[in-house]
């Protein structure tokens, strides 16, 4: 399922601040895993929270936006959006974080604490993280003890 999700996201890239389809897919997957989901944080950001007893709060982050670049790779799952592609791998970052969510929820008996999964919009325009914080991110979710991000 993760490979299919990757290929789907790669086919449907979205520019900074326009990650509506990606955000909807992420929200749906997180809900399916039983996570509390916060949508529209900082525009199109999504945050999933899983409280699993006492312990540290760990935030894992991935970016979601694509670049204004025409794809000419010949891949069978090439971008279907003219002039837009996931040239930086943010589609893969999203899938890796969804995979981590799958695994960590499946083995929740092996760990204790709070897991926060942050899917950041608008990384390429350097505005998404600030927008999420300004939108009250930490009024909605616990302040993390540890942050691990992909890029």
Locate predicted features.
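Acidic/histidine-rich catalytic neighborhood of metal-dependent amide-processing enzymes
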Residues: 92-151
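Acidic/His- and Gly-rich active-site-bordering loop/insert found
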Residues: 1-86, 91, 95-112
């Amino acid at each position: 399922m993760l490979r299919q999700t990757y290929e789907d996201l790669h086919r449907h890239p979205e520019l900074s601040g326009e990650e509506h389809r990606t955000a909807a897919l992420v929200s749906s997957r997180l809900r399916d895993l039983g996570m509390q989901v916060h949508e529209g944080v900082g525009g199109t950001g999504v945050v999933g929270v899983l409280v699993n007893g006492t312990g540290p709060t760990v935030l894992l982050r991935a970016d979601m936006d694509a670049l204004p670049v025409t794809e000419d790779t010949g891949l069978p799952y090439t971008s279907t959006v003219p002039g837009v592609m996931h040239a930086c791998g943010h589609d893969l970052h999203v899938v890796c974080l969804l995979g981590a969510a799958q695994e960590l929820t499946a083995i929740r008996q092996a760990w204790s604490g709070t897991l926060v999964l942050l899917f950041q919009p608008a990384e390429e325009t350097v505005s998404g993280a600030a927008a999420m914080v300004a939108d009250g991110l930490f009024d909605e979710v616990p302040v993390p003890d540890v942050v691990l991000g992909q890029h």
